Design a protein with these regions (language model features):
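Conserved acetyl-CoA pyrophosphate-binding loop and the N-cap/start of the following alpha-helix
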Residues: 93-105
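Conserved active-site alpha-helix within GNAT-family acetyltransferase domains
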Residues: 100, 122-139
């Protein structure tokens, strides 16, 4: 069974190894500077940073995944939304219902949110889970400028 707990600075080694695996998987379509990924980890464990929360997912006391949740406001929904960002599980832990449990837990922790949002790449097998849970596609293409 999976357990969910807040990420701490002591998790840096284990989490950053999983972050590296996530960013070198088909779930990500572009390269991200490792310094940016480390900065995101630091923000996720900083209690003074209200916009991101990091979770460590454990099976039998061993880290097997991580998840970042990010809060935002959307004019389109007239309220807050929760970005379910970077949900990663080790391959041997997939297909056990852990992803659904983590997503439901995150949604229960943030009932104030009017939308729960996530991103998937084309062909991501996890999309079937998300659709089963009630997520639907919005036909937007993202455009960004990074600074």
């Amino acid at each position: 069974m999976i357990s969910i707990r807040e990420m701490t600075a002591a998790d840096e080694g284990a989490v950053m190894e999983m972050v590296d695996r996530f960013y070198h998987s088909p779930a990500v379509e572009h390269e991200v500077d490792p310094a940016v990924l480390r900065r995101s980890f630091q923000a996720a464990v900083d209690p003074a940073e209200p916009l991101i929360q990091g979770l460590v997912l454990e099976e039998d006391g061993r880290p097997v995944g991580y998840h970042y949740m990010c809060i935002g406001y959307s004019a389109e929904v007239g309220g807050r939304y929760l970005l379910l960002d970077e949900l990663y599980l080790d391959p041997e832990c997939r297909g056990k219902g852990y992803g659904e449990r983590v997503i439901r837990w995150a949604m229960e922790q943030h009932p104030e949110c009017l939308r729960y949002r996530l991103e998937v790449t084309e062909g991501n097998r996890a999309a079937r889970l998300y659709e089963r849970m009630g997520f639907r596609y919005l036909d937007y293409k993202q455009m960004v400028i990074d600074r």
